[in-house]
Amino acid sequence: MNTTLSGKIALVTGGSTGIGLATAQELAAQGAKVYITGRRQAELDAAVAKIASTAVGIRADVSKLADLDEVYARIAKEEGRLDILFANAGGGDMLPLGAITEEQFDRIFGTNVRGVLFTVQKALPLLSTGSSIILTGSTVSIKGTANFSVYSASKAAVRNFARSWALDLQGRGIRVNVVSPGPIKTPGLGDLVPEEHRQGLYDALAAQVPLGRLGAPGEVGKAVAFLASDAASFINATELFVDGGMAQI
């Protein structure tokens, strides 16, 4: 049994499905006690059952500050501290430039940017020396991607958050890094297109990856667990791509 993270307290936002769920499972497998958030209770309950007997699910929307207050109040009461924060909750839509609405823009930036900022800010009183913050970025933050400009811009903001927050937190011994997945086969990826077009999307994306395939959520989870661990103790303000080389060539 891997006990790298034994005794650590972790929070994974957006932890009920996809990358968040796989990461929560990996953190728990390495010994951490894991709290997850999600917006849908049924998915949250199912995820907790898949993670560990000690896992805790809290229904919350990270774009709502009152929800975040409730999350951290519970962790403070039950644990008194937080060692690992994976600010993962987010999402986006395929939106051509001429079709983007104010509502869509506000929703995507509300979760991916505003939500990440306040997820981290409100965690600060619980984070102590040696804590690790990991943000979910994306390869699209450094590439032009048709019909994906709002999501891409939101993830570029997340990348800069890590750079800036590493400076804001210097002296506290808290590391801030970004894990940036490429095409990972998750429900969220499939939901970008109608069901009849999903395999075509998967094939087109895999063709752009030097390794010739899509990634698995668990592969991102292992990268997050590494960044959360003492093995990454001198890694700060960096971006770790888990993309099979897609954004690097």
Descriptions of predicted regions:
Residues I9, S16-T17:
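Conserved glycine-rich cofactor-binding loop
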Residues F86, Q170, R175, I235-A237:
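Short, small/polar-rich loop/turn modules that mediate ligand/substrate recognition or access, typified
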Residues P96-L97, T101-F109, L201, L205:
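Substrate-binding pocket helix/loop in short-chain dehydrogenase/reductase
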Residues V120, S154, A162:
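Active-site helix of classical SDR
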Residues P125-L126, L167-D168, S233:
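Alpha-helical segment proximal to the catalytic Tyr-Lys
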Residues S138:
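Residue(s) in the substrate-gating loop at a strand-loop-helix junction
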Residues K143, A225, N236-I249:
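Short C-terminal tail/terminal secondary-structure segment
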